[in-house]
Amino acid sequence: MKFVVSLTFRLNGSVAENEAAAGRVLDVYSKWTPPAGMTIHQLVSRADGAGGFAVVETDNAADLIDTTSKFAPFADYEIYPVVDIADGVRVSQEAIAFRESIK
């Protein structure tokens, strides 16, 4: 199953605290590897530097917890299950046809 993960850095401290946290998260990231069962299709940073997005695929929700918990002190997460657009369009068309069949 595919997921879009949105992360927003927790910039709630003083400038010095935020700078220290930025260095720490980079140290942690440099040692991190994705869980074996998770494929990262895309990992991008926001242009404003305040977070990023990932498109990941896994059949095990624990892979998401494994990753987000390692970075939880530094970021807030929102995780959305997603489908490829062709599948989403097909299902939407089927839903419309279903509703139209009811008189």
Predicted regions and their residues:
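A common structural microfeature
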Residues: 51-53, 76
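Short S/T/G/P-rich N-terminal loop/turn motif that feeds into the first structured element of a domain
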Residues: 1-50, 84-85, 89-103
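An amphipathic, aromatic/His-enriched active-site/gating alpha helix that lines ligand/cofactor pockets
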Residues: 32, 36, 58-91
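Short hydrophobic/aromatic beta-strand micro-patches
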Residues: 8, 55-57
